[in-house]
């Protein structure tokens, strides 16, 4: 175990500020919340969740927070419950509200830091459910660097319709099938009414489950917790255990900076590749590493991608949901398999105070005969499904997810749109034909603002049967539920004057997953001419989106809002 063991006095390393005579007014306020003389002698531990009634991902988190409080009390500390915001991607998707999704990641991070810092807690548990909750919590945890544990609200159960498993993405794709004449409106309604049966994060290897898994692999969540379903007894137990664990971290003197090492991030990328995780993992892991002062770049993803096979037959490109993985051993069983075959660093410390290898000894192997995780000898794909592309269309990089995509190289004419809505209208009107390259720009971190996801558009293309025949490129993002021939995070973005701003309808575009190329057949001379003729629209400048647009970095840097120049602060 890393970290110096603390004495009882040291444990209250922040809340002891309330002890002096001059802090009598502060204590008066705290007494009104139920604290007594005895309680002032114990550590104050926060429990902060993104509870909200607007989404199944988060609707149960307040009750889970109460369980974390019980664990904290059992270890002799004083728990205090807080709330912060969430934006539900599935509800915001395809609407102007989607601009607030990625923005919310940094608001969540800032609000957790403000609440925990403003009240001098000694440690805290962060509980999240929807996509941006996880990286937002982790950015705060890394920035504060006090004992903390992240606890995931758990995955939703699959919906059932006509004896088959369905989920939210089934509804999105149903729209494309309806437009193509393959489903009636009533059939789509039946899918809609059965897709989401209760609480929990979206059920495939989408962004919420991807990031919860990555955090467990990093060592900042309890082993096994990321794959426990939202409504399971295991989930209730792991939340209570998280409360206990964070107080034990405090007693051990164990901090996030002891856990969030370069090797930890390498392992998180490794498991993300093996499970076929979301493209958003690139963005969020870069941001989390930045907060932890760990050097991580897009190129690191390609290095690991070339070595790690894709093993999981999970949605969106596979047939199983995350609950199925839980039933055959969960994330720990996958980690055991990868560790045994030399893919992970087993000697890293985790929030339990034990190493990765020591934690995994307590878990069973993958269930014999299971079909969710394929063997290394016969993987779903020989290398990882998340690929970083470069070329004259994305000099700073772009992210492609190629799981389930048979096409290795696509060359076609661009059809350029400056909004997702315009692109959707064109697809629904059958103006996009096989071979086309649909390009949606001015939707990056600054241009959106907020880098909205294109799940509505990508799902309609797949639903119309064009998933392998039409490429979709954007300086925006894709949902973890997206699959098909898609490339996002193109950097520099159009709003920053990136080459995508000067692409025109009819230009030939190449996407090649073998050479990792993304390029346009436009000469440097023609590009310079177009640049001189193009006026980039002004940055959005009102409210929170205006603040975000003016502060956010490139997607290639994780779209962080504190990317200061090293010479100004010393922080890279």
UniProtKB/Swiss-Prot annotation:
EC number(s): the record gives 4.2.1.9
A Gene Ontology molecular function term for this protein is: magnesium ion binding
Report the catalytic activity.
Answer: (2R)-2,3-dihydroxy-3-methylbutanoate = 3-methyl-2-oxobutanoate + H2O; (2R,3R)-2,3-dihydroxy-3-methylpentanoate = (S)-3-methyl-2-oxopentanoate + H2O
Q: Where does Mg(2+) bind?
A: 89, 131-132, 453
Indicate the residues that form the catalytic site.
479 (proton acceptor)
- Record keyword Magnesium present: yes
A Gene Ontology biological process in which this protein takes part is: isoleucine biosynthetic process
Q: How is the cofactor bound?
A: Binds 1 [2Fe-2S] cluster per subunit. This cluster acts as a Lewis acid cofactor.
Q: Which UniProt keywords are present, listed alphabetically?
A: 2Fe-2S, Amino-acid biosynthesis, Branched-chain amino acid biosynthesis, Iron, Iron-sulfur, Lyase, Magnesium, Metal-binding
Q: Which Pfam families match?
A: ILV_EDD_C (PF24877), ILVD_EDD_N (PF00920)
Q: Which residues carry this modification: N6-carboxylysine?
A: 132
Q: Does the keyword Iron apply?
A: yes
Cofactor(s) recorded for this entry are: [2Fe-2S] cluster; Mg(2+)
EC supergroup of this enzyme: lyase
UniProt pathway = Amino-acid biosynthesis; L-isoleucine biosynthesis; L-isoleucine from 2-oxobutanoate: step 3/4; Amino-acid biosynthesis; L-valine biosynthesis; L-valine from pyruvate: step 3/4
The record's section on SUPFAM superfamilies has: IlvD/EDD N-terminal domain-like (SSF143975), LeuD/IlvD-like (SSF52016)
Q: Where does [2Fe-2S] cluster bind?
A: 57, 130, 202
The task this protein performs is described as: Functions in the biosynthesis of branched-chain amino acids. Catalyzes the dehydration of (2R,3R)-2,3-dihydroxy-3-methylpentanoate (2,3-dihydroxy-3-methylvalerate) into 2-oxo-3-methylpentanoate (2-oxo-3-methylvalerate) and of (2R)-2,3-dihydroxy-3-methylbutanoate (2,3-dihydroxyisovalerate) into 2-oxo-3-methylbutanoate (2-oxoisovalerate), the penultimate precursor to L-isoleucine and L-valine, respectively.
The UniProt similarity line reads:
Belongs to the IlvD/Edd family.
- Assembly behavior: Homodimer.
Q: Which protein are we looking at?
A: Dihydroxy-acid dehydratase
Gene that this polypeptide is encoded by: ilvD
